[in-house]
């Protein structure tokens, strides 16, 4: 399966809700959901059938994959690892997704969206514990310190992210220093700490068949 490179607003329209994939644009009347709140495609307006059973489980999985920009193989690996670990499988799945470096860069306000955060990680603008890490899926651990590299602090995308995040409350499991573009993981995220429009239990049911 190739990575999706088309317009991300179509993904929100397909799921019928805002997935906040384009940062600040999602909070304006320019958002595609505000203009065309129906599925993309020739017959998008006519899709009125109620989704149940497998279809509902599939939609929840697709939402999670699209929010975190993961492919099917990688997403299934997260599930397999969560299912083998002690604890609630769905919560452990979300925990792994939240601890991705690109997601944490987004949560810390280094970018206005996960997509932007993924780019700044890939381009080597983020370091973990003083070392450059350019792997978006890198799993950050409790105690790790994440920051924007000194030479990258003036990037327009980073400054936009800082301005956007300065008015937002920081996640309870992260310690954020907006002035120095840095942060620290102080604990693993609990499900109640993660504002995510996904029913992870339906994903577990889908994969456990």
Curated annotation (Swiss-Prot):
This is Small ribosomal subunit protein uS4. One of the primary rRNA binding proteins, it binds directly to 16S rRNA where it nucleates assembly of the body of the 30S subunit. With S5 and S12 plays an important role in translational accuracy. Keywords: Ribonucleoprotein, Ribosomal protein, RNA-binding, rRNA-binding. CDD domains: S4. The keyword Ribonucleoprotein applies. It comes from Acidobacterium capsulatum (strain ATCC 51196 / DSM 11244 / BCRC 80197 / JCM 7670 / NBRC 15755 / NCIMB 13165 / 161). GO terms for molecular function: rRNA binding; structural constituent of ribosome. SMART domains: Ribosomal_S4, S4. GO terms for biological process: ribosomal small subunit biogenesis; translation. Signal peptide: none annotated. Part of the 30S ribosomal subunit. Contacts protein S5. The interaction surface between S4 and S5 is involved in control of translational fidelity. The keyword Zinc-finger does not apply. Residues 99-161 form the S4 RNA-binding domain. PANTHER family: 30S 40S RIBOSOMAL PROTEIN (PTHR11831), SMALL RIBOSOMAL SUBUNIT PROTEIN US4M (PTHR11831:SF4). Belongs to the universal ribosomal protein uS4 family. It holds the Pfam family Ribosomal_S4. It comes from the Bacteria. GO terms for cellular component: small ribosomal subunit. SUPFAM superfamilies: Alpha-L RNA-binding motif (SSF55174).
């Amino acid at each position: 399966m190739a990575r999706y490179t088309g317009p991300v607003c179509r993904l929100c329209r397909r799921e019928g809700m805002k997935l906040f994939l384009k940062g600040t644009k999602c909070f304006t009347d320019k958002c595609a959901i505000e203009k065309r709140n129906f599925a993309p495609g020739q017959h998008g307006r006519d899709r009125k059938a109620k989704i149940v059973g497998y279809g509902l489980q599939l939609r929840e999985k697709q939402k999670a994959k699209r929010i975190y920009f993961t492919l099917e193989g990688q997403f299934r690996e997260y599930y397999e690892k969560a299912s083998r670990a002690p604890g609630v499988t769905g919560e452990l799945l979300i925990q792994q997704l939240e601890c991705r470096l690109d997601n944490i860069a987004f949560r810390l306000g280094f970018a206005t969206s996960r997509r932007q955060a993924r780019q700044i990680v890939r381009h080597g603008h983020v370091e973990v514990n003083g070392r450059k890490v350019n792997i978006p899926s890198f799993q950050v651990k409790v105690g790790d310190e994440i920051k924007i590299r000194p030479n990258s602090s003036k990037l327009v995308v980073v400054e936009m992210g800082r301005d956007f995040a300065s008015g937002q409350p920081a996640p309870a499991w992260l310690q954020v220093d907006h002035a120095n573009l840095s942060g620290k993981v102080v604990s693993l995220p609990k499900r109640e700490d993660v504002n995510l429009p996904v029913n992870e239990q339906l994903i577990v049911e889908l994969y456990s068949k």
